[in-house]
């Protein structure tokens, strides 16, 4: 294992720009539920769009925003509009794309079916699962509403990052999670590993800690516990808990490192290969303890060796 540790250190030392891909951000603001919430959601939408454009350098044409019924301009957050957009996204997305979806507003659970409240007919967790199925590329969906846990159970898929504001469908009160999730997106301190980039996992962890502190400072029982799932088992875990989830979310960055303007097709292919290897390494970690140690170590070392070789080749070609 000494060789493996040496290789891992080498990989981090050889960090190089990642492949530029289309990064989509889809902000879905559903039915507001009243003037008080409408004002709050307008602030959240505005802050989200601003931080995505300014801090994370998303291109304006790839930031889609659906608004609540109180908004005077913009596409309404109706089931019809949302379905139409995602149908088009399925056609235009590619396997190298990253699609970040965040749901703002309110959710309900009637004891059987969980829904996200929209302007007009609501959409169930299954509706959302069916709608985003088939999107090419990496997908991260954050449901910030009350009663959101069933969305994690439904949307779970290996490699797909799903975050819900609650760990139970029974939590029926408006959540504070979106406030702290957006705040975490804006703060440099969220970059916990200090690598100059901010991952979905880091935002989730920072927001979760802030929610806990929110309730403690008010002397209240914590009624919402956010969960993250990215291994496809539909269970998820809290940021402060141990568990298999989080590997993919740790390398799902909101910001994108720039590819050199003179990048050749060969360099682009190498960068794609490195991203694939990084994901395979995270997935392989989930097999620790499941397969024989000797076999696990051999496969992991093989992945790390190739990752180091590819990273070295990328650095070499980037310096030309």
What are these regions (language model features)?
Residues 4, 18-100, 107, 114-116, ...:
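Boundary/activation segment at the start of structured domains
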Residues 5-17:
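Bacterial N-terminal signal peptides
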Residues 31-39, 68-76, 89, 113-119, ...:
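Second-shell loop/turn segments in exported
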Residues 36-47, 51, 77, 81-88, ...:
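Extracytoplasmic/secreted proteins, especially bacterial periplasmic and envelope-associated proteins
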Residues 46, 140-230:
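Active-site-proximal C-terminal subdomain of hydrolase catalytic domains
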Residues 86-120, 135-176:
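Active-site microenvironments of hydrolase-like enzyme catalytic domains
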Residues 144, 263, 270-273, 278-318:
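Alpha-helical, heptad-rich or low-complexity scaffold/stalk segments
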